[in-house]
Amino acid sequence: MLKVENVTAGYLQSPVLREVSLQLEDNECACVVGANGAGKSTLMSLISGLMRPSSGSIMFNETSLIGLSPSKIVDLGIIQVPEGRRLFPRMTVAENLLLGARNARARPETKASFEKVYHLFPILEERGKQKAGTLSGGQQQMLAIARGLMAKPKVLLLDEPSIGLSPILVAEIFKTVGGLVNDGISVLLVEQNVRAALAVSSHGFLVERGRIVLSGKSQDLVEESAIKRGFIGG
């Protein structure tokens, strides 16, 4: 279980997040939604160890993540797929995937992990020898997610995976993401595409100006006036 409690964080003296609390249960897909600049990506950086909060706690099971290095957090099984994909464009698809399996948890199961991600994203097996930089945007996003899965995550942090993709590709990728919980992977999804994120998750959190202003079951949040008015219409 991942638990963020009363976390405040920011840059210099300007808070980006203010007293944020959320919880991700085992085998759950939850989403954090909101407009650009609301603080969603900062939350991901805090959980991944790229930033430290000024106050509050971040716990994974019984372990505090605050003060741990990003590599140690990876070893615990928390893997981030960052916004913008951040692939190695001159390396092949297979080489990019192999980089995801470098931690101690993943190395012994590299072969099985290749089989798994190729089953989830067959196009990546077809393009295994192709340079990552020559893939389409949708294929690059599939590769970024697959590289994260190569690390054998217990928790997968997905930061804005729908950016720049067509609605058809978004639906395809989100369907795969929603199915990861059946493999024992918890998913925390950060998204501006509120409709798609709520459709694939069981719980959601709406962030506005650094604060969580709404939370609950995704099916209930869809009917909230603030969600309808600001993000999905109605």
Segments from the language model and where they lie:
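ABC-type ATPase nucleotide-binding domains, specifically the catalytic core motifs of the NBD
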Residues: 12, 68, 93-111, 120-122, ...
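Conserved ABC ATPase signature
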Residues: 131-135
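The feature captures the beta-strand-to-loop junction immediately N-terminal to the Walker
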Residues: 33-35
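ABC ATPase C-loop
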Residues: 148-149
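Conserved ABC transporter NBD signature motif
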Residues: 56-64, 76, 109-114, 216
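Conserved catalytic motifs of ABC-family nucleotide-binding domains
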Residues: 152
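Helix-to-loop junction immediately C-terminal to a conserved catalytic motif
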Residues: 48
